[in-house]
């Protein structure tokens, strides 16, 4: 028989990406089929045609009678069965290799983007997309196989085809020569001159091997059915439990720096953005109750720069107690999708900014209030 090392190496790689039932099935395939077929079975059928003797001297009669009794050798039939049954598993392995290649490309792209990010480039959104794709194409999670999506469908289809091939080969074997061998075969076929009797060597030994291989096929079929029900039940159970969507989980876990640095993100999380209205000395901004831990260390340098700009502006104006400019007093102009605060959690609704004047009235303000203005009404 040929060398099974190439097929063995390929099937050995499937062990890392199979369930417990799949690993047991591969063990049955290796131990009770490939190894047994390469050692004991081949030696038992080594002389099947040479030891097939008919009681006639007619040339060619033994050959045609052997062809009628055994359309295909049992050994070659079982080799075909192993190849057909292993093909769906190899196709599943090809899908696994495809996903591994996708993951390698994403890793290389992520390294390139991180190098760009270290140089000051803004690639946060691209890194977030790569994280989502890696979650989709990833193969291992906490040491376990992540079998979902297309990979799960491929695995279920491979189990179905393996089961169909097992049933098909069992039916074909029963149709061609049954599950036992007789010691005498009667043949009446040209060029035999009359009905002749042909004798088979070691029929009992060969019958034992036939039954053994039949039992192995039935066990393999049962493992496939059990694994199919288990995988289907597991996927349905996960769907009923309403597991969190992996993409939304990834979106929550991976928040880009661009969004965290935006004024809208800061406002809705209770943080002061660099472009938010500033309160001059003596004033206090009230924005509602927020979580102080989420605002910690938020754009500290930008806030200091804004205060420096504000002080410079006040010095240029020469008015120590001037009111807040209209530029700083303008409300936020958010897009429509952020103005609906009904969807926010209770206790975190947006509250309008209110300015509490806690400073004492100054002389400058009193004099400024008594100065006549052009638009005042005369009494």
Curated annotation (Swiss-Prot):
Primary localization class, coarse: membrane
Q: Where in the cell is it found?
A: Cell membrane; Cell junction, Gap junction
Query: What's a single GO MF annotation on this record?
Result: gap junction hemi-channel activity
Membrane disposition:
Multi-pass membrane protein
Q: Which PROSITE patterns match?
A: CONNEXINS_1, CONNEXINS_2
The record lists its disulfide bonds as 54-192, 187-198
State what this protein does. One gap junction consists of a cluster of closely packed pairs of transmembrane channels, the connexons, through which materials of low MW diffuse from one cell to a neighboring cell. Plays an essential role in gap junction communication in the ventricles.
The protein here is known as Gap junction alpha-1 protein
Species of the source = Xenopus laevis
Q: Lineage in the entry? A: Eukaryota, Metazoa, Chordata, Craniata, Vertebrata
What is the primary gene name for this protein? gja1
